[in-house]
A protein has these predicted regions:
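Flexible "cap/lid" subdomain of the alpha/beta-hydrolase fold that forms the substrate-access gate
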Residues: 4, 11-50, 54-169
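The serine-hydrolase catalytic nucleophile loop
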Residues: 1
Length: 169
């Protein structure tokens, strides 16, 4: 098998275009189309698709929108977005606060993260670990996460992704 591991738009080394008013620029449908376009550019007619976290949401959308291009589908560690929102409880809201925070209208979360991006990333990552520390992360991984938060276009893209999840998706 050949393995292709693209960054989703706005993440990693991908482009980070400005969002549109309808939150479609970072919708999973748009990103699934990005994946279909990538396969076309690589002259691949069908592919087995595996996705994790945000990528799993895109993989799921790819399967729905492009079934003729899908061999097998693997989804890792997600609940469908609509089910996630429908299951919202106080405990979940505290654990997954970033879903509502990042989905707030621009530029509120962008400005708040931009005030101290490294502190935001470090605190958020630590809260997701059992030990509530950064001990589970290698220095290289932390550097990568922090670098993303230091780029205003990347932060806007991250927020736009969550805005799409709270609206268009």
């Amino acid at each position: 098998h050949d393995v292709i591991i693209p960054d989703l738009r706005g993440y990693g080394e991908s482009s980070a275009p400005a969002n549109d008013a309808g939150n479609t620029t970072y919708s999973k449908r748009t990103m699934a189309q990005d994946m279909a376009d990538l396969l076309t550019a690589l002259d691949i007619s069908r592919a087995d698709v595996l996705g994790h976290d945000r990528g799993a949401r895109v993989a799921y959308r790819f399967a729905l929108d492009h079934p003729e291009r899908l061999g097998k589908l693997g989804i890792i560690e997600i609940v469908p977005t609509a089910d996630f929102w429908a299951s919202w409880t106080a405990d979940l809201a505290m654990a997954a606060y970033h879903w509502t925070f990042l989905a707030q209208p621009a530029p509120l979360p962008e400005r708040m993260i931009g005030a101290d991006p490294v502190a935001y990333v470090d605190w958020t990552l630590a809260q997701w670990t059992l030990s509530k520390s950064l001990a589970a992360f290698s220095p290289a991984a932390l550097d990568s996460y922090r670098a993303q938060a230091l780029g205003p276009a990347r932060v806007h893209a991250m927020c736009a992704d969550y805005r799409a999840g709270a609206s268009f998706d």
